[in-house]
Regions:
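Structured beta-strand/loop patches that form or line metal/cofactor-binding pockets in enzymes
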Residues: 38-71, 156-177, 364-389
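Acidic low-complexity segments
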Residues: 19-31, 36-52, 92-179, 212-246, ...
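Short beta-strand elements
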Residues: 64-77, 176-203, 310-312, 389-398
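Dual-mode signal for accessory low-complexity, basic/Gly-rich regions
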Residues: 271-458
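N-terminal alpha-helical targeting/anchoring segments
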Residues: 51-106
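Internal metal/ion-chelating core segments
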Residues: 175-269
């Protein structure tokens, strides 16, 4: 009766909207769990409608589309807490899944610190008018490829993903809400010989996407990489572009999760109220931002999302909480649940005053970094880490790019590198790709005295 792939469904002889379908699923599961003895239930059915276009060697190679419904559920039996996910929502399969949850509840240990779900909230529907337009996406891919090749790239590859996510929430505490959000992500990589470049664009509206700019950026980076330069290991001033900056700032956001603080994997443990980063740096999480690619009206516990300042002028102001971590920290949920771990929705970093060209002048002599991968922590609790630069790393002398570098690895401490920011750019952009899971809105930034080692001979 319920099918996985669809935007509208036939239900008892009539067509219903996705909102009603998700609510019907949630109510069915919630009522059955309460009938079977659950004292509290929170059900979140989700429909994800996506179109992905991959391109390689200047041509589209793969087009995939999907529309999938799944159900996440938190159920509480006395002092026992169970988290479940159902991906087969056919009537028989759903009944079998519920039966399995009931049986498995006998194996779950009781929790002595179980916080009740928050007071019920009925949320106003949040809808999107955005559509996934395959023809327009194809045009955007062509624009990105053409602008990259005009800049000198020999080969252009990448992926464009358009998604509309529809979430509902039904709680035994009376929580009820429906939320729709659209996101469009374009990631472009360029190649000339052994050199590579990267550009990207992210938005919640297709009209705000900048495919030509993303292609132009990736193409210009690979063009500049044709002039190799020599370098030695040591401490350098660096200009972090938004892509690498977002990846590194994301780890600061992870350290703000109260779950990671308790688990001993946060470098911000015991530092509440202390100045831990540069006064230039203010970081907030904002799950309510209309421009945030991951924004939603409610978190997984039915708490309204909001803007939470995590670090203000370098001083740690707040961790991210769900109701259980909030109880243990004697505070309130910040609207960031995760039934297991609270996490950021969208990270937003304050901007500075400099253009990119002015940032290069401020750097004067150092290294400009575009992107990175293979970030590894030697010690999560202290923030000691390394990461390898990719897709454009450049030697800067007297405020001008003089040559490209290979095999550059940052080997330093996360808190240390952000404790002495020299300047921030004035232009911010959203960054999200497979190395940056939490969308981050930030400018470029100049950091002094960053320790660099060689990942390969260069």
């Amino acid at each position: 009766m319920w099918k996985v792939l669809r935007l509208r469904c036939l239900f008892y002889g009539g067509f219903i909207e996705m909102k009603e379908e998700l609510f019907l699923l949630a109510e069915k599961v919630s009522k059955e769990m309460c009938r079977r003895g659950a004292s509290e239930v929170m059900v979140l059915p989700t429909q994800n409608e996506s179109l992905m276009v991959r391109f390689s060697n200047n041509k589209v190679t793969v087009v995939q589309s999907w529309s999938v419904i799944s159900i996440d559920m938190l159920s509480i039996f006395g002092k026992k807490r169970l988290i479940s996910r159902f991906e087969n929502i056919g009537e028989n399969a759903l009944a079998e899944s519920i039966e399995r949850v009931i049986k498995e509840s006998s194996f779950v240990q009781e929790s002595e610190e179980l916080a009740p779900l928050p007071t019920s909230v009925k949320f106003k529907d949040r809808r999107t008018t955005q559509k996934i337009d395959a023809n327009r996406i194809n045009d955007y891919v062509s624009l990105a490829i053409n602008s990259a090749t005009r800049e000198g790239a020999e080969r252009v590859s990448g992926v464009f993903t358009g998604s509309i996510v529809r979430d509902a929430i039904i709680g035994s505490n009376g929580a009820e809400g429906y939320d729709e959000r659209a996101s469009f992500d374009l990631n472009v990589r360029t190649f000339t010989g052994d050199n590579s470049g990267q550009g990207l664009s992210c938005a919640t509206m297709m009209s705000q996407l900048a495919p030509e700019e993303a292609g132009r950026e990736a193409g210009s980076i690979v063009r500049m990489a044709k002039n190799p330069a020599k370098w030695s290991e040591g401490k350098y001033s660096v200009l972090l572009g938004p892509i690498i900056g977002a990846e590194l700032i994301g780890h600061v956001g992870d350290s703000c999760s109260a779950f990671n603080v308790e688990a001993g994997t946060s470098c911000l443990t015991g530092k509440m109220g202390k100045e831990v980063l540069s006064k230039e740096l203010t970081i907030a999480d904002d799950g309510s931002s209309k421009d945030g690619p991951s924004s939603r009206s409610f978190d997984d516990e039915g708490t309204p999302t909001r803007k939470t300042v995590l670090l203000e002028k370098g001083t740690l102001k707040s961790y991210l909480h769900n109701v259980n971590t909030a109880k243990r920290f004697n505070t309130y949920s910040t609207g960031n649940a995760g039934w297991i771990a609270p996490s950021a929705w969208n990270l937003v970093i304050d901007h500075g005053k400099l253009s990119f060209e002015e940032s290069l002048k401020e750097l004067k002599n150092g290294i400009y970094m575009v992107s990175n991968w293979y970030t590894r922590f030697q010690n999560y609790s202290t923030g000691d880490f390394s990461t390898i630069c990719r897709d454009g790393t450049f030697l800067v002398e007297d405020g001008e790019i003089k040559g490209s570098l290979k095999g550059v690895r940052i080997s330093d401490n996360l808190l240390k590198i952000f404790q002495s920011i020299k300047s921030m750019g004035k232009d911010r952009r959203w960054v999200r790709w497979w190395e940056v899971r939490t969308p981050t809105f930030l400018p470029d930034m100049v950091l002094p005295e960053v320790n660099l080692t060689k990942a390969q001979e260069s």
